[in-house]
């Protein structure tokens, strides 16, 4: 029985990982128990048929929260506790430590931990195993906090349930993105690229999925490029895959991603993708599609060239590229294969 604990407020890659891997492990005969703040995370877990409970975490080390997890872990005979951020470790992690339950710290970004006393003390006292989303993320964390190199530290790629092989092209073609609406995610460069392509007479539509702290700013960036009439902002959606199914071309405009879970979701849906050559993205990129990786600090000019090429390709040629990305997803992060890897690692721990 595995507890997945996540106290973060925003939806991020680790939450998607928890739900996907929890469901896959449940189908392999394990029990999955999800704990999160009131909101979409526990609700989505329940929709997937997982056991889920809303938790009000309070401050780090909150004795009431620790007591709650002590009761829960005893009640459900939890064998492994998987946490995300420090608050998870300093509540559920402490409860797991008292009960002798192995703890895993699931990390999704090189900046998740700082080299400071609180990090050292938590790592020393709780002794969690560490699990990163990519080799890039793992290496970055060890550079930031050298002591982590002394611990059991694995890197296992994220995973998805894969639909059928892509077989359709929309008319007009649809460009879609789904990363968080944050000023650091590079949406302005994507909108600039779309503007340049539109000026060349290319007809297309754009869908921007999700929300974030700078949603209004991103919408203003879209308006400033004259794209309001062809762009749809969906806001928060509970089923990202359904939205991705409406697209043909996916753009990940982020300047740097530890792996790019949004990109993996798009590849798993069989979309032709454009991203920056940075972070962990090259680890999962199809070897034959290097021309669709633009420079890390591109202002949108190279992105415009990549978009123009995909939007004007003959249908069969674009479909072939979509199939390349889908094939890489099948090869690299099919949920059943990743669940097997995680299961094997968990058995070694337990």
List where the protein language model places each region.
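A conserved mid-protein helix/loop that constitutes part of the nucleotide-sugar donor-binding site
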Residues: 12-20, 173, 180-196, 202, ...
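Short hydrophobic beta-strand element within catalytic cores of glycosyltransferases
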Residues: 34, 272-275
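Short His-centered aromatic/hydrophobic patch
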Residues: 83-89, 107
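A conserved, positively charged/aromatic
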Residues: 103-131, 146
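A short, active-site helix/loop in glycosyltransferases that binds the activated sugar's phosphate group
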Residues: 127-152
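Nucleotide-activated donor-binding/catalytic signature segment of Leloir-type glycosyltransferases, i.e.
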Residues: 219-235
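Aromatic "clamp/platform" in nucleotide-sugar-dependent glycosyltransferases that forms part
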Residues: 236, 255
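Conserved acidic donor-binding segment of nucleotide-sugar-dependent glycosyltransferases
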Residues: 287-301, 309-315
């Amino acid at each position: 029985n595995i507890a997945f604990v996540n106290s973060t407020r925003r939806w991020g890659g680790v939450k998607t990982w928890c739900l996907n891997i929890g469901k896959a492990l449940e189908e392999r005969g394990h029990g999955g128990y999800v704990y999160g703040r009131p909101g979409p995370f526990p609700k989505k877990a329940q929709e997937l048929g997982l056991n889920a409970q809303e938790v009000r975490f309070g401050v780090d080390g909150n004795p009431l929260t620790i007591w709650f997890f002590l009761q829960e872990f005893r009640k459900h005979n939890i064998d492994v506790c998987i946490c995300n951020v420090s608050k998870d470790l300093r509540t559920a992690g402490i409860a797991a430590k008292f009960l002798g339950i192995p703890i895993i710290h699931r990390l999704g970004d090189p900046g998740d931990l700082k080299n400071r006393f609180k990090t050292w003390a938590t790592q020393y006292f709780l002794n969690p195993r560490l699990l990163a989303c990519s080799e890039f993320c793992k290496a970055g964390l060890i550079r930031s906090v050298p002591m982590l190199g002394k611990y059991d530290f694995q890197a296992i790629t994220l995973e998805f349930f894969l639909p059928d092989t892509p077989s359709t092209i929309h008319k007009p073609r649809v460009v879609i993105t789904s990363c968080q609406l944050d000023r650091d995610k590079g949406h302005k460069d994507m909108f600039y690229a779309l503007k340049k392509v539109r000026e060349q007479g290319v007809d297309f539509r754009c869908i921007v999925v999700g929300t974030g702290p700078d949603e209004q700013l991103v919408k203003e960036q879209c308006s400033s490029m004259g794209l309001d009439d062809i762009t749809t902002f969906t806001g928060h959606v509970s089923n990202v895959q359904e939205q991705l199914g409406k697209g043909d071309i996916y753009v990940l405009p982020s300047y740097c991603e530890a792996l790019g879970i949004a990109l993996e979701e798009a590849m798993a849906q069989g979309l032709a993708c454009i991203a920056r050559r940075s972070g962990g993205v090259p680890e999962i990129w199809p070897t034959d599609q290097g021309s669709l990786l633009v420079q890390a600090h591109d202002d949108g000019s190279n992105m415009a060239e990549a978009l123009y090429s995909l939007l004007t390709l003959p249908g069969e040629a674009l479909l072939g590229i979509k199939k390349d990305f889908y094939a890489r997803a099948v090869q690299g992060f099919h949920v059943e294969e990743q669940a097997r890897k995680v299961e094997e690692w968990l058995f070694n721990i337990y």
